[in-house]
Design a protein with these regions (language model features):
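Eukaryote-biased recognition of intrinsically disordered, low-complexity regulatory segments
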Residues: 1-16
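Short strand-turn-strand beta-turns centered on an Asx-Gly dipeptide
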Residues: 2, 19, 66-68
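Well-ordered beta-strand positions in beta-sheet-rich domains
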Residues: 12-17, 73, 88, 160
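A cross-kingdom feature strongest in bacterial/archaeal respiratory oxidoreductases
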Residues: 18, 49-50
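Ferredoxin-type iron-sulfur electron-transfer modules in oxidoreductases and energy-metabolism complexes
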Residues: 24-46, 78, 87-266
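Serine/threonine-rich, repeat-prone extracellular segments and beta-strand-based repeat modules
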Residues: 51-56
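Glycine-rich phosphate/adenylate-binding loop and adjacent beta-alpha elements
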Residues: 66-91
Length: 266
């Protein structure tokens, strides 16, 4: 396991040994490692830090690199991993996000991209406004896979265009100034497939499409869809098998039409 004690510090490898039990997943392995915090040679160490929540591949919290592939720890079954490599299992934190400690990373940039593209439907209040617009069953079937995105970050970690952004607070810089500088850097950097997918989801929704131009403006600004290199790694690693490249293609077309319309004063 690749460990790191704090943000900005050097990482180091550590070997642990866990007794095998049937039907274990990587999250259960990490639970046992944290409960018995010592290396394979018996040296006491600090308990491993990692993120998890739902344990059923819904929340997206437990993303890490397992045997060289970014995926969810809760659905990574030990028996299957050992069948591929009986000698050991290798765990590393995601490579495109700043490490907080060990396998836990900061995904602020991921969520900032969703804010940037307005990945929500605005609500004016909580009054009963009656029935909303209807959506055809065919449209529902097409939209549902896009809705299943759990912001896990797998697509971003596998993307060659999505490079790591890790800033540190300067001497004399206030927390507010640092937050503003970090936000600006996030906005200049590639938003990623997850954000493009959410633009497609909300812009295809009968209510969400009322803010379609706002989302297209955001996704064509700096760090937008024009930075996508079409490597298609995102769709290959998505644990929900979301058709990300289809969303990218549709938003690419919509963005082109939006810009042409804007150029000609439409």
């Amino acid at each position: 396991m690749l460990r790191q004690d704090a943000p900005g510090e050097a990482s180091y490898w550590e070997r642990h040994r866990i007794d095998h039990e049937p039907d274990m997943n990587i999250t259960s392995v990490l639970q046992r490692m944290a409960a018995n915090a010592e290396t394979a040679d018996g040296r006491p160490v600090t308990p491993v830090a990692y993120d998890c929540n739902c344990l059923e591949e819904v929340c997206g919290a437990c993303t890490m690199i397992i045997n060289g592939r970014v995926r969810q720890a809760c659905t990574a079954l030990v028996d299957k991993l050992l069948a591929d490599n009986p000698a050991e299992i290798e765990l590393r934190p995601m490579s495109k996000f700043p490490v907080i400690r060990d396998l836990s990373v900061s995904r602020q940039r991921l969520f900032r991209a969703l804010q940037k593209v307005k990945a929500w439907i605005p609500a004016d209040g909580y009054y009963d406004m009656g029935g909303g617009p209807r959506q055809a069953p065919e449209e529902q079937l097409e939209a549902y896979p896009l809705y299943t995105c759990m912001s896990c970050g797998c697509c971003l970690d596998a993307c060659p265009q999505y490079t790591k952004v890790e800033l540190t607070q300067h001497d004399g810089e206030s927390a507010a100034e640092f937050a503003a500088r970090e936000k600006a850097e996030f906005d200049r950097s590639f938003a990623g497939a997850h954000a493009i997918n959410q633009v497609q989801y909300y812009n295809s929704h009968p209510t969400g499409k009322m803010q379609a131009d706002d989302r297209l403006e955001a996704i064509t600004s700096a760090g937008g869809i024009q930075d996508c290199g079409n490597a298609q790694n995102c769709v290959a690693v998505c644990p929900k098998e979301i058709p990300l490249t289809t969303s990218i293609g549709k938003i690419g077309r919509a963005a082109t039409l939006y810009k042409l319309k804007k150029f000609f004063g439409g």
